[in-house]
A protein has these predicted regions:
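Positively charged n-region of N-terminal signal peptides that target proteins for export
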Residues: 1-6
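Bacterial N-terminal signal peptides
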Residues: 8-18
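Accessory terminal helices/loops
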Residues: 15-16, 223-225, 236-299
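Boundary at the C-terminal end of the N-terminal hydrophobic targeting segment
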Residues: 20-22
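Conserved beta-strand hairpin/beta-sheet module of binuclear metal-dependent hydrolase folds
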Residues: 29-77, 182-194
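Divalent metal-coordination and catalytic microenvironments
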Residues: 30, 53, 63, 78, ...
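Metallo-beta-lactamase
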Residues: 58-60, 66-68, 160, 167-251
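Active-site HxH/HxHxD metal-binding segment of metal-dependent hydrolases
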Residues: 76-160, 179
Length: 299
């Protein structure tokens, strides 16, 4: 009975803690992940992840989710952890589910940072995506108050940020998921925010990807020796998940190419891929979209 009571108290404490942080998970003394894996709906950013790093001088935010509404939700949870000024926002890439919440943090005076290629991508496609949000399963009310905010600072290959006692490395890992994808690496606690280089338990979005570079990037990330990896989508991960992502990409590309060359249509190719690949979230929709956009563009 004593063991049961102790266990019950522990569970209650953990539940209270999770409610207090509302999605923020403490990874180290000053690093938190914001994991969205429980709700993969469009209005909740397709379960995109984000995070924060807290230094003596302020806060760095990693990705801002899909809308002003989602950004405000994220900000409210950040304020339960710290009242320090938010100095920087880093977009690991500028797809809508990772960068359309920029407006919330820019209003606070945060400097938004990305790789130069993904600033160009957002400038080219952001307004059009807002105009045709229904194509992404979003309703007008989901994007109420959302404005496209382009990164104010860019870099080419690598950038270091001293947040006051916390060293942060921004490393270009492209071309891969996009032409300007980057990772956020904290060498001291060995924590990596991979952005959409890594999808764990989710089928990845491949439409803008360059698979040869993506596979090389996954090789490189395994050499960093991260103790904890926050993927772009999915639960807290490890090097094992990076390796499984490589296996997935190779298998997807090989099978899709072979079947497309035989004249198979999108439904047949998707069905075979879903039969072969590990079961993951966003299955039929994502796999079908990837097949049509990468392997059947002329059909």
């Amino acid at each position: 009975m004593q063991k049961i009571f102790t266990l019950s108290v522990t569970v209650i404490v953990l539940l209270i803690a999770s409610l207090a942080f509302a999605g923020l998970t403490k990874l180290s003394e000053n690093v938190y992940s914001y994991v969205g894996e429980k709700d993969a709906s469009p209005s909740h950013s397709f379960a995109a992840n984000a995070g924060i790093v807290i230094g003596r001088d302020g806060v760095l935010v990693v990705d801002t989710l899909i809308s002003a509404k989602e950004g405000e939700r994220f900000l409210a949870d950040i304020r339960k952890i710290t009242k320090k000024p938010i100095k920087y926002v880093v977009n690991t890439h500028t797809h809508l589910d990772h960068a359309f919440g920029n407006c919330v943090f820019a209003e606070l005076g945060a400097t938004v940072i990305s790789h130069s290629a993904d600033k160009t991508l957002l400038a080219k496609s952001g307004a059009e995506i807002l105009t045709h949000a229904e194509a992404y399963g979003l309703k007008p009310e989901d994007l109420a108050g959302t404005a496209i905010v382009l990164p104010a600072m860019t870099f080419s290959e690598r950038m270091s940020i001293d947040l006051g006692g916390v060293e942060i490395e921004l490393i270009r890992t492209a071309p891969s998921h996009t032409d300007g994808s980057l990772v956020v690496w904290l060498p001291q606690p060995k924590i990596l925010f991979s952005g959409d280089i890594l999808f764990t338990d989710f089928h990845p979005f491949l439409a803008d990807g360059e698979l040869t570079g993506w596979l090389k990037t996954l090789d490189y990330l395994q050499t960093l020796g991260a103790d904890k990896i926050v993927p772009g989508h999915g639960p807290l991960s490890s090097n094992k998940d990076l390796k499984e992502m490589q296996t997935y990409l190779i298998a997807f590309d090989r099978t899709a190419r072979e079947l497309a060359a035989k004249g198979q249509d999108a439904d047949a190719i998707s069905a075979e891929l879903l039969r072969q690949l590990p079961k993951r979230s966003l299955a039929e929709w994502m796999v079908g979209y990837n097949v049509k956009s990468r392997y059947l563009k002329e059909k």
